[in-house]
């Protein structure tokens, strides 16, 4: 709570995962005592885990991870639930180009989409893993008209960079 209050003058986008998200009691304490927006959800895995967050108005934004929630279909269900509570969604990214593009594709048809949470300064680092570079212009990602997510993993690159003991 002290940290969130100290950040209030800086108009941050959100205070991410301020407490373990399964502790709705602690999250409520933070929510009631700070003025910064709160974002939670990267560690929740199903739409049912988002219910208490949404019903109790414990977050200004939610950030489900498309990989950890089970894919695009579950992510879209979570987004629809959040829309009913007027809560914007910002898919979490910590897994690479497939995760970024899956989240971006899902959000292309979600009215309460805020942004795809990622480390935009490092997105081009993903290009070595894939057959087509991510189309990043400014602060936006543009989706391909190629089938699926619009990319394929560069299997030759992946094979050449296998870490001993981890497959290959």
Where do the PLM segments sit?
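C-terminal extensions of enzymes
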Residues: 130-168
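Adenosine-nucleotide cofactor-binding segment
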Residues: 1
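Shared catalytic-loop signature of beta/alpha-barrel
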Residues: 5-8, 14, 20-140
């Amino acid at each position: 709570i002290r940290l969130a209050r100290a950040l209030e003058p800086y108009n941050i986008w959100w205070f991410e995962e301020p407490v373990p998200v399964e502790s709705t009691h602690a999250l409520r304490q933070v929510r009631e005592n700070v003025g910064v927006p709160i974002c939670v959800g990267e560690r929740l895995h199903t739409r049912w885990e988002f219910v208490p967050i949404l019903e109790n108005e414990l977050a200004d934004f939610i950030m489900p991870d498309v990989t950890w929630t089970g894919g695009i279909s579950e992510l879209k269900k979570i987004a629809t639930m959040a829309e009913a509570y007027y809560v914007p969604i910002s898919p979490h990214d910590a897994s690479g180009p497939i995760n970024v593009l899956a989240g971006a594709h899902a959000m292309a048809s979600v009215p309460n989409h805020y942004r795809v949470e990622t480390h935009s300064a490092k997105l081009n680092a993903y290009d070595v893993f894939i057959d087509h570079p991510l189309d990043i212009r400014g602060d936006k990602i543009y989706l391909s008209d190629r089938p699926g997510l619009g990319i394929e993993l560069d299997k030759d690159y992946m094979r050449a960079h296998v870490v001993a003991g981890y497959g290959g």
